[in-house]
Regions:
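Short, charged/polar surface micro-motifs in flexible loops or helix N-caps
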Residues: 31-33, 41-44, 64, 102-104
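Short histidine-centered beta-strand/loop micro-motifs
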Residues: 26-29, 37-38, 46-52, 68-70, ...
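Histidine-centered metal-chelating micro-motifs
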Residues: 45-47, 66, 78-87, 105
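Ligand-binding loop in jelly-roll beta-barrel domains
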Residues: 71, 82-112
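Short, conserved beta-strand element in jelly-roll/cupin
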Residues: 39-40, 50-66, 99
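A short, N-terminal "cap"/entry segment at the start of jelly-roll beta-barrel domains
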Residues: 1-34, 47, 113-116
């Protein structure tokens, strides 16, 4: 009889908070989806970007973020569909859990910011 185990991992051992998906290192290597937990300080400048294929399911665990004029706060869920350009404004220190499907390496397209 084999007994189960629990393994412990440090999120800092994974690239950018992404710990499940079709990349290394990964706790579960799969092309089906990706999972991350990220913490963003208030005012952090994040890449303005979009995904051609993937859909992101996001849950705000702490803080507040504004995307496209809508403020998402602790407890809010929001879905970002393919080809929607995201330019987040972190209004407070913010922690977000993201599930992205499918897991497609290279499916992030950065959009240049134009200054007036």
């Amino acid at each position: 009889m084999t007994k189960g185990t629990i393994t412990s991992h440090d999120i800092s051992d994974f690239k950018g908070g992404w710990f499940i998906g079709d990349f290394n290192p990964s706790l579960l290597k799969t092309k089906d989806f990706e999972v991350s937990v990220k913490t963003h300080p208030k005012g952090e400048i994040w890449d303005k970007h979009y995904h051609k294929i993937a859909t992101e399911y996001n849950y705000v665990m702490e803080g507040a973020v504004e995307i496209d004029g809508v403020i998402y706060k602790k407890g809010d869920l929001f879905v970002i569909h393919p080809e929607f350009v995201v330019d987040p404004n972190f209004l407070e220190d913010c922690s977000i859990m993201c599930v992205k499907t499918p897991s497609v390496v290279g499916d992030k397209y950065v959009v240049k910011r134009w200054r007036s």
